[in-house]
C-alpha cells in the first residue's frame, strides 16, 4: 500500500484523492493473504528471506499470540536453504509443522530431515508429510491466541509429487478445514 501511495503521490495526486482508494487495495492472492474471520495467513514464502519476513510480520501483527508455521521445501531444488529455513522457523515461530511442498522426484522425508537439521531440539515440531492433512490438522487445532502461517505455495493450485502434477490449493484446503 505504501508503494502504491508513493507512486501516485509522485504523480501529483493529493492525500484526499489517494487515501480513500488505499482501503480498497489487497495483496495479490497468496501473498500474506488472511483467510476471512481467522488468524490464518497464506503466503508464497519459499525462500529463507521470505519466510523470515512473513513470520516477523505475524509476530508484529500478533504480539500476544503464539505463532505456528506450516511449510516444506521443494524437491530437486536448492538443498542449502532447507536447514536455514528450519533455523528461521525455530527462532521465530512457537510451533512448526513440516510437510510436503513440491517434492518432485525427491523423497519427502529426506527433504523434511534436511529442514529438521536446522531446528532446535526444544522446538515444538510436528511432521505431517501429506500437505492436505497437515493444513487440516493445523487449522482444526489452532488455539484462540494462535496465528497460523501456511507458507510455500501461496497462490499455486497444483502440487508436483514424483512425475504427477496434482490439483492442490493451500487456500482451498484451509478454507474447507475452517468450515
How should each PLM-predicted stretch be described?
Residues 3-179:
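ATP-dependent carboxylate-amine ligase
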Amino acid at each position: 500500500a505504501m508503494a502504491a501511495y508513493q507512486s501516485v503521490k509522485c504523480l501529483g495526486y493529493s492525500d484526499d484523492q489517494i487515501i480513500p482508494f488505499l482501503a480498497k487495495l489487497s495483496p495479490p492472492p497468496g501473498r500474506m493473504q488472511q483467510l476471512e474471520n481467522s488468524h490464518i495467513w497464506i503466503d508464497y514464502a519459499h525462500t529463507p528471506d521470505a519466510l523470515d519476513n512473513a513470520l516477523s510480520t505475524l509476530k508484529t501483527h500478533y504480539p500476544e499470540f503464539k505463532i505456528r508455521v506450516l511449510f516444506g521445501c521443494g524437491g530437486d531444488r536448492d538443498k542449502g536453504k532447507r536447514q536455514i529455513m528450519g533455523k528461521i522457523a525455530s527462532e521465530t515461530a512457537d510451533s512448526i509443522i513440516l510437510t510436503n511442498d513440491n517434492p518432485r522426484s525427491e523423497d519427502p522425508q529426506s527433504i523434511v530431515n534436511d529442514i529438521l537439521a536446522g531446528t532446535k531440539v526444544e522446538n515444538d515440531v510436528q511432521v505431517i508429510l501429506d500437505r492436505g492433512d497437515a493444513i487440516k490438522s493445523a487449522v482444526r487445532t489452532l488455539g484462540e491466541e494462535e496465528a497460523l502461517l501456511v507458507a510455500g505455495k501461496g497462490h499455486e493450485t497444483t502440487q508436483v509429487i514424483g512425475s504427477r502434477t496434482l490439483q492442490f490449493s493451500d487456500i482451498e484446503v484451509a478454507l474447507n478445514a475452517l468450515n
